[in-house]
Amino acid sequence: MTADNNTEALDSSTTKDVIQKGISVVGDLLGVVGFPFGGALVSFYTNFLNTIWPSEDPWKAFMEQVEALMDQKIADYAKNKALAELQGLQNNVEDYVSALSSWQKNPAAPFRNPHSQGRIRELFSQAESHFRNSMPSFAISGYEVLFLTTYAQAANTHLFLLKDAQIYGEEWGYEKEDIAEFYKRQLKLTQEYTDHCVKWYNVGLDKLRGSSYESWVNFNRYRREMTLTVLDLIALFPLYDVRLYPKEVKTELTRDVLTDPIVGVNNLRGYGTTFSNIENYIRKPHLFDYLHRIQFHTRFQPGYYGNDSFNYWSGNYVSTRPSIGSNDIITSPFYGNKSSEPVQNLEFNGEKVYRAVANTNLAVWPSAVYSGVTKVEFSQYNDQTDEASTQTYDSKRNVGAVSWDSIDQLPPETTDEPLEKGYSHQLNYVMCFLMQGSRGTIPVLTWTHKSVDFFNMIDSKKITQLALTKSTNLGSGTSVVKGPGFTGGDILRRTSPGQISTLRVNITAPLSQRYRVRIHYASTSQITFTLSLDGAPFNQYYFDKTINKGDTLTYNSFNLASFSTPFELSGNNLQIGVTGLSAGDKVYIDKIEFIPVN
């Protein structure tokens, strides 16, 4: 089986379950990252173990998911060795979590004696060393891509475990030197695990590049599913550093994922567009925006028998906005074919569209098959009023049957809540691609993670991370470029001195609340960052180069530019400028962090 015809092998409940587990783990982590964890730490461990370690089955499913995507099998010896290691790790982690739970429940001195300290140190060290010794079993030569989801989940558990030495090490009786050694190890492994995941994600993606529409569908499935189970996870690794993040962290994932085209591969009979046409046509790296309006165009498709004629979604415009409170409306180019029927406008204006359910139909002629999307119901949620509702595009002629549901590919974060609360992704863009021979259009929907805050609210209690791609506008000479894979989204790049961007922020705390700022950056030269509020400079400092010209961006390419002077957010528009760049230099900017100062 080749990449061009492997698409249908992935349609299974197993794949949906694997994706749901990956989404659930990331969602749980987003709720607890940063310190102090308090009682939430043991609760997280318990939920995590129940999600991925109720048995060995989830780990088998992680492996089978990538095997199906790559159309390749892991050798029995390698799979059996990995599963045996995972069983041992499960035993070690469960023993440690049980001891940690008892430790937290019994703060009195009689319980926390040298014996109990020694016991929890022993269990922690056993679990931690077992991870170090087991990780090579999830990176066996020739199977690195197939083990990648397993590797990422195991790496996440190891790093999350390691940070406990910084929280409890002194209580447990570790010497300061031992605690420092654990911290050094955590930093080293964060870099090692992150770079491994990015490298082998890209290797797998490149292997799936093809020429046909069918190969693009499989390529995009790999990109989407590995984003959900690997790249989203590694974006959170730095937040386990409790020395850098001594408070809870409010963060978000701004990357896009594309669901499968609504028109199924089997219905196209070779009439889909080409791999390069669809890949070159999808959105390039861009400033983050949210869905405002879709204008649907409709055409009539006659059928050979007459009664199989139907209307279909033939094209669309999309309108978006950069952030809540902005009056700017960005209108897309037109996608598809213009309407021969009245257009339909659906306006969302910031409500979270968390599900799309589509109807399709076919018209069969002796020489061809014509396929089209006839109806789409969009479920949306207003998180300000706590109300759910639906809007529908309806072609109003022979709409056929439901054949596509976004939840099958982007399952909810949790099933313990109604879908409008437990959903994982929200719609932010739609496109249409023309089939070959003018046989209809292929709609494709783009989604972003529910963690994104459309208001850019700065929390007065937590460290707030905002991606600089959420800027409302860019300085001349600044561009949005593809992220390196571990940042949770795209990043900004500048090659000359000047203003990088303007970021609109909002606060609910009193204006007297002060903050410090850090910028996550990579630079080929020593630079000076200048911060201004509504045009008035308030912070300026120089920072070291982090990379050489021509270097590929890896985890250690980035550093944190920390400003020590606290300030009050007396304005809404934050400008970031840079000087110190010469010809050939580049500075990359990922996120800005706002740290509340008491």
Predicted regions span which residues?
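Membrane-inserting effector segments that mediate pore formation, membrane fusion
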Residues: 10-74
